[in-house]
């Protein structure tokens, strides 16, 4: 009887569908038509008393929201179009550690703590045509194995948005970008044992100014990555040519010129703000 409300992406959308299916059994004042509700509940294997208790909680929350925001309750819940992302970011904020990444080898979801959990057979996601890569689980119940109940597909970047205090960033691959005239790198955001953001492009000067300055000198200034050449670079080229001539005479190719020393010389004299 509940199969009509199930959703392959989210058990919470299934709950919302159930709620919306109950709304026609209210009168124009919002009161329940109990006889009709009782028949529907019996046919749908729902507990009418629990339905009414659920309704009371929803009404109390709506009143509290209206009082807090100092506005009317607005549209009836059944009339509102609920954005998937907004609903599930809110749910994820309540259980920010209870998310997982599908592990094909183990055929289960790897959790942020390093363990594994499986989709509970009663979930709408159990019979879904595909396994969603990332999910949140509102309930984790351990019996013969750790089962996830009340699940939903999520975007891993939502973890960083709702729980930045649980995330840490790892940076690398700093490179000079000639088109942008700056040093850029890659950011990886990790929560627990799972990377929720991979390869996000970042301005490296805001991450590690000293390292970015070194990349600028080596790749941008001395590596020919600048759009405009200054007289200083002409001097360096002339000096490199002169040293090359000396190396040829001494039969010591690349034995006199020290690129690292030149880089260190430039780093010492060019301010990091440049």
PLM feature spans:
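Second RecA-like catalytic domain
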Residues: 1-182, 210, 214, 236-264, ...
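GHKL/Bergerat-fold ATPase module
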Residues: 174-239, 244
């Amino acid at each position: 009887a509940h199969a009509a409300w199930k959703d392959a992406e989210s058990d919470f959308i299934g709950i919302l569908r159930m709620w919306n299916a109950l709304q026609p059994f209210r009168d124009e004042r919002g009161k329940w038509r109990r006889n009709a509700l009782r028949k529907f509940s019996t046919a749908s294997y729902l507990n009418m008393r629990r339905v009414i208790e659920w309704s009371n909680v929803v009404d109390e929350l709506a009143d509290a929201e209206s009082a807090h925001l100092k506005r009317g309750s607005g549209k009836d819940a059944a009339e509102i179009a609920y954005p998937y992302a907004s609903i599930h970011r809110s749910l994820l904020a309540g259980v920010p550690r209870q998310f997982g990444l599908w592990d094909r080898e183990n055929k289960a979801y790897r959790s942020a703590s390093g363990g594994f959990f499986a989709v509970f057979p009663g979930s709408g996601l159990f019979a879904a045509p595909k396994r969603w890569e990332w999910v949140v689980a509102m309930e984790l119940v351990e019996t013969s194995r750790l089962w996830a109940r009340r699940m939903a597909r999520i975007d891993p970047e939502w973890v960083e948005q709702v729980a930045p205090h649980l995330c840490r960033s790892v940076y690398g691959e700093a490179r000079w970008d000639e088109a942008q005239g700056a040093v850029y790198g890659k950011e990886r955001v990790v929560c627990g044992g799972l990377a929720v953001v991979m390869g996000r492009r970042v301005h490296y000067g805001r991450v590690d100014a000293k390292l970015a300055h070194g990349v600028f000198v080596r790749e941008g200034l001395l590596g020919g990555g600048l759009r405009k050449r200054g007289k200083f670079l002409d001097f360096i080229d002339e000096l490199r040519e002169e040293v090359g001539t000396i190396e040829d005479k001494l039969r010591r190719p690349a034995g006199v010129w020290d690129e690292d020393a030149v880089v260190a010389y430039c780093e010492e004299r060019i301010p990091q703000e440049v």
